[in-house]
Design a protein with these regions (language model features):
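Active-site cofactor/cluster-binding pocket
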Residues: 45-80, 84-85
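N-terminal glycine-rich anion-binding loop in soluble enzyme alpha/beta folds
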Residues: 1-45
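Mixed-charge interfacial surface used for oligomerization/domain docking
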Residues: 1-12, 68-72, 76-81, 90-93, ...
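Alpha-helix boundary/capping residues
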Residues: 33-36, 57, 131
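Short catalytic-loop micro-motif centered on adjacent basic/acidic residues
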Residues: 41, 62, 94
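A short alpha-helix capping/helix-coil boundary motif
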Residues: 29-31, 58-59, 88-91, 135-138
Length: 168
């Protein structure tokens, strides 16, 4: 759908960069990262990436991965301010998903439903805020290895969790 544009995160190693878009082969990435022994890192989209995605739209609904794990929300917030200052008649509804999982897709689908129903911009933003109060997904990580490799978890904690077969 041309109205839905992804602004991807990136996972990097000293050997390769993985861009989280439709061309990413997740199985290959997981296999390669599992065998990679070096340090990995993540990079959120920058303000320019968000501005490019906003394009020339009159209404933008920007959904970000949780601000507690990524700088995506902050970069999108700066882009929103720049966009609305440059184009005073355009609006950006910035949504911190407070999630790192499928909840982003649920929010997207709800926005599509509200747009299709003909709601105005402000109503949609308010409805999404209310909708988020009732959408909470819980998931479990099989391993903490990648989190340790990119500095988000102490490597000793990841090792102990693996030895004890603890899933978080």
């Amino acid at each position: 759908d041309k109205h839905i544009i992804s602004v991807p995160l990136k996972i990097t190693t000293d050997k390769k960069e993985y861009v989280d878009d439709e061309s990413l082969d997740i199985e290959v990435m997981i296999r390669e990262l599992a065998s990679y022994k070096g340090r990995s890192g993540t990079a959120c989209p920058g303000t320019g990436d968000w501005l490019d995605a906003f394009g020339d739209a009159d209404w933008v609904f920007a959904i970000t991965i949780t601000s507690t794990l990524s700088g995506s929300y902050n970069a999108a917030r700066v882009a929103k301010e720049e966009y609305e200052n440059e184009y005073p008649n355009r609006k950006v509804c910035l949504i911190d998903s407070l999630s790192a999982g499928a909840e982003l897709k649920l929010i997207q689908e709800k926005i599509e439903e509200l747009v299709a129903a003909g709601h105005d911009f402000d109503t949609i933003c308010n409805e999404i805020t209310e909708y988020q109060k009732h959408t909470h997904l819980i998931f479990c990580l099989k391993s903490l290895t990648n989190l340790a490799n990119n500095g988000r978890v102490n490597p000793a904690v990841a090792k102990i969790a693996g030895v004890l077969n603890i899933h978080v």
